[in-house]
Amino acid sequence: MSANDIKFFTPQIQLLDEVYKNASVTANLDGNSALVSMTANGNEFQIPVMDMDGLGEYNRKTGYPEGGVSLTFETKKPNIDRARVFIVEKMDNQESAGLAFGALSGEFLRTKAVPELDATRLATYCTKGKGKLTKTLDPNDGAVWVKALSNATVDMDNAEVPQNDRHLFITSDGLTAVNNMQTIESRAILARFADVTIVPQPRFVSAVKLLSGRDTEDKGGFAKADGATDLQFQIISGSAIMQWTKDIVNKIINPVENQDGDWWKFFFHLYGICEVYDNKVSGIYSCMKEATA
């Protein structure tokens, strides 16, 4: 791989970030990248962790009570670590190869990588979050959806989950049922959330199985895990989770150097972390369908 290869394809690689943001339904939960760094080996995240004690009595003689408020960094290994190799046949010039790579990688992100990433994140938050309701909601009855959403917000209010940082993820039929009511109650409940995002059902399940991309699972991707059920809505407080992702095309082999054949090879690596802070599990509320026999 030459430095010129990487330099030439850099514009296409940088555009992948925009493709991700536009295609992902969970990109709005991404943490502040300025607060996260990678370790020297580039394989682990350094995540900011806040620890704080409550106020104590100030004493005129002894001064401030012991304890305090601190920001430290905890090293975390990624729980998302996936990869693929893109192959582009040799073309007349490098410009054509760049356009082909841009189209290929963009389509791959939109149709393969992002749906898997969304599904993995939402399933992880469902598993680790505290709030759960297992009840199949009638898609033709908006009132039952409003009631379930109202009960969820009350639970989160009582758990002191920040009210201005709650993001609602909901199925299309669920949101349609609520909107079709056109009542004060239906409008009021949706106004409780920082934003409302429709999630396609294949990405919205309680657990996923990630396929290896090898042997009998050579197609890769993800599937609904055995025993998993469909999610109907999920409320997530941004402050309750740690979510960061890196996608890197960190290696390119041109047709001249490629010993496998007369084509370009682009090595794509997607890794990241999606976790729930141990002391903020009440910041996740998931409503899922009842299991069917």
Report the location of each language-model feature:
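Hydrophobic alpha-helical segments and helix pairs
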Residues: A97-A148
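Short, glycine/acidic-enriched capping/hinge loops at junctions between secondary-structure elements
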Residues: E57-G63
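Sequence/fold signature of self-assembling virion shell proteins
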Residues: S2-G31, V36-M50, G54-G56, L71-N79, ...
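Charged, low-complexity surface segments at secondary-structure and domain boundaries
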Residues: M1-N4, E89-N93, G131-P139
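Long, hydrophobic/aromatic-enriched structural stretches that serve as scaffold segments
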Residues: E66-E116
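Extended, solvent-exposed, turn-rich assembly/linker loops in the middle of proteins
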Residues: K130-T197
